[in-house]
């Protein structure tokens, strides 16, 4: 059960990250696609490392 929840949570975060990156790439046409997200372009960007750390802490 714990593994199923972790897999679903990880998939959900991955989808959020994918669509967030796509929206940012469309908004900033001059951005380098290999440079990663630009925190200045999206002040409400999801901090995936913090979410992953929280999930790891909560789930063991």
UniProtKB/Swiss-Prot annotation:
Q: Which UniProt keywords apply?
A: Amidation, Antibiotic, Antimicrobial, Fungicide, G-protein coupled receptor impairing toxin, Immunity, Innate immunity, Repeat, Secreted, Signal, Toxin
What's in the GO CC field? extracellular region
- Out of the domains of life, which is the source? Eukaryota
Principal localisation: secreted
Q: What's one GO BP annotation on this UniProt entry? A: innate immune response
Q: Which residues form the propeptide in this entry?
A: 26-45
Residues that bear Leucine amide: 59
Q: Does the keyword Chaperone apply?
A: no
Which parts of the chain are AXPX repeats?
A: 31-34, 35-38, 41-44
- Kindly indicate where the leader peptide sits in this chain: 1-25
Tissue specificity note:
Expressed by the venom gland.
Task: Indicate where this protein resides in the cell.
Answer: Secreted
- Tell me one GO molecular function of this protein: toxin activity
Family designation = Belongs to the MCD family. Mastoparan subfamily.
Official protein name in the record: Mastoparan-VT1
- Taxonomic lineage per UniProt? Eukaryota, Metazoa, Ecdysozoa, Arthropoda, Hexapoda
